[in-house]
């Protein structure tokens, strides 16, 4: 059994003037440890996004990567400094799914398309007889792997912001495709 640990992070920048967004961009990243040794990193960025979407996308990308690299019985731990993301997949999504992907107050779920895509990947991981765990880590602290993911996400965000284009950096070029295509 191989142990995969992904440290994920997302970042976004928005410039507002007179209450209107003039320009925005975001970045995401993951750092992968296999059996507690750094194995690889992956990051990307795109215009017109939010911080929460990028946090979720980092999780999506890490799960896609895990499904490509893992074998039956492997273990994966997703480490994120986003309480929003951790709570979605450890507390809220189970009830949302039971209620037809609706919140108990009837309000729409933000980022639902991406959440459902991650939910589908979670099912694929389980069907592969792999164990999946989510872990909340403290952001901007002494955790070198979370700090590295934060730095990579910030760099990708800045490049996407300056260029206005989708960018991708990683060992598996084409793994994730264009932002507009990343979720079915």
Predicted region positions:
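RNase H catalytic domain
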Residues: 11-18, 63-148, 180-183
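Short, surface-exposed, polar/charged, turn-prone segments marking secondary-structure boundaries
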Residues: 33-36, 59-60, 104-108, 115-116, ...
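Short, surface-exposed, charged/polar-biased interaction segments
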Residues: 99, 106, 155-158, 170-174
